[in-house]
Amino acid sequence: MSLGIKRKKTAVAEPKIHFSWKEAKRQKSLLIWSGIIVIYGIIFYYLPLGGWLMAFQNYRPIDGLFHSEFVGLQKFQQLFSDATFLRVIRNTLAMGVINLVVTFVAAIAFAVLLNEVRNTIGKKTVQTISYLPHFLSWIIVTGIIHDALSGTGIINELLVNLNVINQPINFFAHKEYFWPIVAFANVWKETGWNAIIYLAAITAIDPSLYEAASIDGAGRWAKIKHVTLPGIRPTIMILLLMNVGNVLNAGFEIQYLLGNGLVQSVSQTIDIYVLNWGISQGDFSIGTAAGIFKSVVSIVLIVIANQIAKRNGD
């Protein structure tokens, strides 16, 4: 039954933003630094996008960007008809996915296990040691890997002494070893550093959840499964979303430094392909087209990952 009572709708006033020269003067330092950041972004991130025009031209440095012959999508057709580029895409995707999965799982596992260490001194020592490889350049890391996996290196000596092999293996002459070597190098170098954010997420979990699990008789593994991992799931999803777009950034330094003619068919990535065409052979148009392809695919991967995350409610 309606009582005939009409309720007045109260309008919510939207906050108005007033520009004040006095406030601007007070925030002068902040505005100056903000302006510097904006200018930096325009100069180094947006203006270089004009170079994408080279992908649609038969670019010659002598003619310049605005006077080179326009060829449309011819360079892209040439790119995708090149069997080498298709192989490079395979290598980049394979190494990117392997590195993403292996380093992702390794960082989560390391953070969870390190959180279970009760000895404070031991825990901090392990943390510090695990961070150190991140600060080494890839040149140093590849040098260490070369020495360790050489014919007289520690790995071959260990395998021979354990009678696993009879003769030393030339790891850098066999294609089947290259991707695992790259994956191991990434895990060794970045696991400790990548685990920092997971350790921070674990410390933010409500301790009462662990206490309740202990009352219910849960052991360490049960707490990890039902408390720790669900507690850091949002962090995992966010980092996964951020890293999916970097799948095609499988690397350049380590592949370039460890690669050689014997493993070239599995070591070349898109970045190395761009270097070979754009710098070594001087075909800037092909190099730019390959770079655009990489950027577009990365954006598509981010959008897809974002949609999947939304559907899963994360």
Tell where the protein language model's regions lie, with residue ranges:
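A structural signal for multi-pass alpha-helical bundles of membrane permease subunits
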Residues: K22-D314
